[in-house]
């Protein structure tokens, strides 16, 4: 029946050919991934929506993307096959700082700066760059086979998204939730822009703690000593602060001291902020260069002035003009020593804020910026998570979320960049600000057309926090449409825990504020991928494999399967490229098992049409099944129950292992092997055809269950089961459901056969019986029922154990035989003629000596009180477990030796 020989499945699985045939282009061409609001609003379909975290337009595919998008694809494909109107919303982020930096670097190579070009021409260059390179990440994601509705692809600078951003800013300003204020912000001297607190990462740094003496103005023979790690800011000191409860300085409060080098007189003030235990208990107050000092200065009406500029160099007024801040630090310490003000230096390790992108120390900088008041937005966003309206997976990330929300600060949203959404604020010649959706509206409000727009742009995250809304066509407050009514709130967000506050929390705030509902129901936090040494993947370490090269070597399905298989919920992933052999081997196993089953189909059905008709009408019938078939159906339905339960609990890693374990173990290692024996034995045509249809039916169910994980190979093989049209795809097939009628199926007979096969193999291995030699086994059944069960394996035993088996309730044990007991039934394997007794005795004696020595070393270690009391409890428990296992092994080896003696 060659016309349907595995529907021409090649002998060897070639992932290049299969995946090229099924690239997303084919699925897209037939509209597989399209979702329509009409099917929800008019036909009553249940919606299921996933938001793609928009990758930076500057990005290229990483293993982090692979894990994140594979998980999203699994959720969306599963929902689609569960009959839901599944919508996955794709898009990219304009990535303000990153994109501007890339384009500026390109211009510098051409000898041009953005200032040479001017704002308009520079932005034209950025748009040109985006058109040429900005789609790379999406093309690479398509190679992964992800099933987005690509018609809905959105870029955060697209007209619709930009309209939403501007209207949101205007609305929040008019509500009093956006304001312009003079505050200490995080300044990146490389990117030359303000940063939000979340864009600053803390790193441990070793500096000098500098102790400086400040003489009293009225009596320079007396002084007060402070300790600081920033002596370069001494020229901007406006006070010395002490704790009002610190008796050491009680008599100095209100006195004036002389600022070293500067020579100015500043007061000693009392403030509860001062930590009595830190340093000397006295602090220099430099409000322009420290946010805490700034708050102290406001409380005491102190002046504020700066000595470090935007370029992190000392300003003209301070006497060290033009020096880099760190060079100035060294010079000022030297000058303090020369002038007699330096008391001492100490090594000091502390956490310092760095720009996450530029990797330079952030400078606290006093400037006018735009802010969002976060407290009114945070309270309802905290409540919905506390109340369980939004669920986190794993749950422990709720604690991180709570910490952020309970300690929230106003959000600095202005950035000193050109690429981004320009702040919709205009100024008249008197300095009044007019916030409006357009220049024309601003002119109308101001009563003049002589207005200049704010030069700054909005933080990239200001567009991202609206993502659940803008991807569905929302253009601002009071905006509504059919997509929003059908697909908002979305269902599942898959993202990294590192942006819980950057993005997750802010989306929750925006959704609640503008739509009165949460933006999503569940948040799945992905694992961090590390190399095999436990290090985070990075280009600088050279330990970050190129996913496209991995795909070329192992296949997309293999990479997708592997990365989910090794990524338990809430645990870091140790990834080495060689681990993808796991996925490749599994794909090969699926392919080979499918080819075998299809070959049996050819043997039992005269024509393709005959099989197709039989399979279309196939229903598993117990009376036509062998014990292996009934066992398979019991195991298959148990697998489906566990599969769906794992998906309901977001245990994708468990789900993948459940299917892998069933297919490789139950289906291939046991049922397919049993089927070989069954079909070569004395079997009627009806039962044979039924057995093959059962094998194909379960195979098809496994392919459907695996499709969300391995979309290419599953669609390829599914099309080989029966004739399909070009418009058909497994992606829209119904996901198999467990049949409760098989839940209580008595599978004990085949379980006994399986256990007996395993023990025969184990005994052969224990006595070193060569694999190519056939042995004689005798099984003494414990009861008539056990004998009946074992007789169902008569055809299986020779094929799976290379043993001829004699069965009975009163059979005799052969001389010189190895013995064991399986579920109360006695097993004997005749050894005479199979092995050299003397050689085997020598081998066993040598092994006993080796294990005995190991036992003695373990006993010695566990008798050492120091080890037992100091080692971690799990380590001690593991050593005890090894000891028990070794003792059991010696007893078993001694028993085997006895048999040979």
Curated annotation (Swiss-Prot):
Highest taxon of source: Bacteria
Location in the cell: Cytoplasm
Gene3D superfamilies reported in the protein's UniProt record: HUPs, Isoleucyl-tRNA Synthetase, Domain 1, Valyl-tRNA synthetase, C-terminal domain, Valyl/Leucyl/Isoleucyl-tRNA synthetase, editing domain
Gene Ontology cellular-component terms listed: cytosol
EC category: ligase
InterPro entries: aa-tRNA-synth_I_CS, aa-tRNA-synth_Ia, Anticodon_Ia_Val, M/V/L/I-tRNA-synth_anticd-bd, Rossmann-like_a/b/a_fold, tRNA-bd_arm, tRNAsynth_Ia_anticodon-bd, Val-tRNA_synth_C_sf
Recorded catalytic activity of this chain's protein: tRNA(Val) + L-valine + ATP = L-valyl-tRNA(Val) + AMP + diphosphate
Keyword line: Aminoacyl-tRNA synthetase, ATP-binding, Coiled coil, Cytoplasm, Ligase, Nucleotide-binding, Protein biosynthesis
Keyword flag Cytoplasm: yes
Entries under Pfam families matching the protein: Anticodon_1, tRNA-synt_1, Val_tRNA-synt_C
GO function terms (MF aspect): aminoacyl-tRNA deacylase activity; ATP binding; valine-tRNA ligase activity
Coiled coil (residue ranges): 831-901
UniProt-annotated binding residues for ATP: 539
GO biological process, one term: valyl-tRNA aminoacylation
Motif 'KMSKS' region: chain residues: 536-540
Subunit field text: Monomer.
Chain's role: Catalyzes the attachment of valine to tRNA(Val). As ValRS can inadvertently accommodate and process structurally similar amino acids such as threonine, to avoid such errors, it has a 'posttransfer' editing activity that hydrolyzes mischarged Thr-tRNA(Val) in a tRNA-dependent manner.
Family: Belongs to the class-I aminoacyl-tRNA synthetase family. ValS type 1 subfamily.
Comment on protein domains: ValRS has two distinct active sites: one for aminoacylation and one for editing. The misactivated threonine is translocated from the active site to the editing site.
Stored HAMAP family: Val_tRNA_synth_type1
UniProt protein name: Valine--tRNA ligase
Organismal lineage: Bacteria, Pseudomonadati, Chlorobiota, Chlorobiia, Chlorobiales
């Amino acid at each position: 029946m060659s016309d349907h020989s595995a529907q021409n499945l090649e002998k060897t699985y070639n992932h290049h050919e299969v995946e090229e045939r099924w690239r997303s282009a084919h699925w897209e061409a037939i509209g597989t991934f399209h979702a329509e609001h009409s099917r929800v609003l008019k036909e009553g379909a249940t919606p299921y929506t996933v938001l793609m975290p928009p990758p930076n337009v500057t990005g290229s595919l990483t293993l982090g993307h692979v894990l994140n998008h594979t998980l999203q694809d699994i959720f969306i494909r599963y929902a689609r096959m569960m009959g839901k109107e599944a919508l996955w919303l794709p898009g990219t982020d304009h990535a303000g700082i990153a994109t501007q930096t890339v384009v500026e670097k390109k211009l510098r190579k051409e000898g041009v700066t953005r200032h040479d070009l001017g704002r308009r021409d520079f932005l034209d260059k950025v748009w040109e760059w985006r058109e040429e390179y900005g789609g790379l990440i999406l093309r690479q994601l398509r190679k992964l086979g992800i099933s987005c509705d690509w018609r809905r692809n959105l870029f955060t600078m697209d007209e619709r998204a930009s309209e939403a951003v501007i209207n949101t800013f205007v609305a929040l300003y008019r509500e009093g939730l956006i304001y312009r204020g003079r505050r200490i912000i995080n300044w990146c001297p490389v990117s030359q822009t303000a940063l939000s607190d979340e864009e600053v990462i803390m790193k441990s740094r070793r500096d000098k703690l500098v102790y400086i003496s400040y003489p009293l103005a009225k009596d320079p023979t007396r002084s007060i000593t402070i300790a600081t790690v920033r002596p370069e800011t001494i020229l901007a000191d406006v006070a010395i602060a002490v704790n009002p409860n610190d008796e050491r300085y009680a008599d100095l409060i209100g006195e004036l001291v002389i600022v070293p080098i500067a020579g100015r007189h500043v007061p000693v003030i009392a403030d509860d902020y001062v930590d009595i235990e830190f340093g000397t208990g006295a602090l220099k107050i430099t409000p322009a260069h420290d946010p805490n000092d700034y708050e102290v200065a406001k409380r005491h009406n102190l002046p504020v002035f700066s000595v470090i500029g935007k370029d992190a160099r000392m300003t003209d007024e301070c006497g060290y003009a033009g020096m880099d801040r760190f060079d100035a630090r060294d010079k000022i310490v030297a000058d303090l020593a020369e002038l007699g003000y330096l008391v001492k230096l100490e090594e000091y390790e502390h956490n310092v804020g760095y720009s996450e992108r530029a990797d330079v120390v952030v400078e606290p900088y006093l400037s006018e910026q735009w802010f969002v008041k976060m407290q009114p937005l945070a309270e309802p966003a905290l409540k919905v998570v506390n109340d369980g309206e939004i669920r986190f997976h794993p749950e422990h990330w709720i604690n991180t979320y709570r910490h952020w929300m309970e300690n929230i600060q106003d959000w600095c949203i202005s950035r000193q960049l050109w690429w981004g959404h320009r702040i919709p604020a205009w100024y008249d010649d008197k300095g009044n600000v007019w916030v409006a959706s357009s220049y024309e509206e601003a002119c109308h409000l101001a009563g003049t057309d002589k207005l200049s727009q704010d030069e700054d742009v909005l933080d990239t995250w200001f567009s991202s926090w609206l993502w659940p809304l803008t991807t569905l066509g929302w253009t601002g407050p009071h905006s509504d449409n059919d997509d929003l009514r059908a697909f908002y709130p979305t269902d599942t967000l898959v993202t990294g825990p590192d942006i819980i506050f950057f993005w997750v929390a802010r989306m929750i705030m925006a959704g609640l504020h503008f739509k009165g509902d949460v933006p999503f129901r569940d948040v799945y936090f992905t694992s961090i991928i590390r190399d095999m040494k436990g290090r985070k993947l990075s280009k600088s370490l050279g330990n970050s494999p190129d996913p496209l090269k991995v795909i070329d070597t192992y296949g997309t399905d293999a990479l997708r399967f592997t990365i989910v298989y090794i990524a338990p919920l809430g645990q870091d992933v140790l990834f080495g490229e060689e681990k993808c052999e796991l996925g490749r081997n599994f794909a090969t196993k699926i392919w080979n098992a499918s080819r075998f089953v299809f070959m049996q189909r050819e043997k039992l059905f005269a024509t393709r049409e005959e099989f197709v008709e039989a399979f279309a009408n196939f229903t598993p019938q117990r009376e036509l099944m062998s014990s292996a078939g009934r066992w398979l159906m019991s195991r298959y339905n148990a697998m489906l129950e566990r599969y769906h339960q794992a998906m309901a609990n977001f245990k994708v890693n468990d789900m993948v292992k459940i299917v892998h374990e069933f297919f490789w173990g139950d289906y291939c290692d046991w049922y397919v092997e049993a089927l070989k024996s069954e079909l070569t034995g004395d079997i009627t045509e009806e039962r044979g055809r039924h057995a093959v249809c059962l094998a194909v039916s379960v195979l098809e169910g496994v392919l459907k269950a695996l499709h969300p994980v391995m979309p290419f190979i599953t669609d390829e093989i599914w099309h080989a089961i029966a004739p399909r049209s070009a418009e058909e795809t497994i992606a829209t097939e119904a996901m198999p459901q467990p049949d409760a009628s098989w839940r209580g199926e008595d599978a004990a007979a085949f379980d006994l056969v399986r256990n007996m096969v395993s023990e025969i193999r184990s005994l052969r291995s224990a006595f070193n019986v060569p694999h190519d030699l056939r042995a004689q086994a005798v099984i003494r059944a414990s009861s008539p029922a056990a004998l009946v069960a074992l007789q169902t394996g008569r055809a299986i035993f020779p094929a799976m154990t290379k043993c001829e088996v004699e069965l009975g309730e009163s059979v005799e044990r052969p001389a010189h035989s190895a013995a064991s007991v399986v579920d109360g039934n006695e097993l004997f394997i005749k050894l005479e003629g199979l092995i050299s007794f003397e050689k085997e005795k020598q081998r066993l004696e040598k092994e006993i000596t080796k294990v005995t020595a190991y036992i003695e070393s373990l006993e010695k270690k566990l008798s050492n009180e120091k080890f037992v009391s100091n080692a971690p409890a799990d380590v001690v428990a593991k050593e005890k477990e090894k000891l028990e296992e070794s003792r059991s092994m010696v007893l078993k080896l001694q028993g085997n030796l006895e048999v040979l003696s």
